[in-house]
């Protein structure tokens, strides 16, 4: 990753902010892929209820997201247990909040608007992706000056 970053840093308009957004889109893409594939497997292969499948997909993707966001997106350094505990609890707390948005939007799209489960999942992921970036950037992994 460092070799790529060094190469990208040679581009005059490539800033830390652009790097953070680009890395969030890449890692967010992987997180979304994990979420959708897990949801699809649980719903269409295992034939589980979409709410259970959504919860399992959420757990799998949030675990991946924490480590990828910490290391590659926000390059967060937490030297003390207290800082690490604050970061972990705020990350999972805000992700739980967006999980509630996720499940409520899924229910609305599927049961009220009769949208296909997989399409509902994809649209819901767009909403959740934006909310998670805002929470991560300005609250969870906020750089102290």
Curated annotation (Swiss-Prot):
Keywords linked to the UniProt accession: Cell membrane, Membrane, Transmembrane, Transmembrane helix, Transport
GO cellular component: plasma membrane
Domain of life, source organism: Bacteria
Transmembrane portions of the chain: 21-41, 52-69, 96-116, 121-141
Topology within the bilayer: Multi-pass membrane protein
Pfam families in alphabetical order: GtrA_DPMS_TM
Cross-referenced InterPro entries: GtrA_CellWall_Glycosyl, GtrA_DPMS_TM
One biological process term in Gene Ontology: polysaccharide biosynthetic process
Subcellular location as annotated: Cell membrane
Function per UniProt: Involved in the decoration of cell wall teichoic acid with galactose and glucose.
Family, similarity comment: Belongs to the GtrA family.
Protein name: Cell wall teichoic acid glycosylation protein GtcA
Natural source organism: Listeria monocytogenes serovar 1/2a (strain ATCC BAA-679 / EGD-e)
Gene behind the chain: gtcA
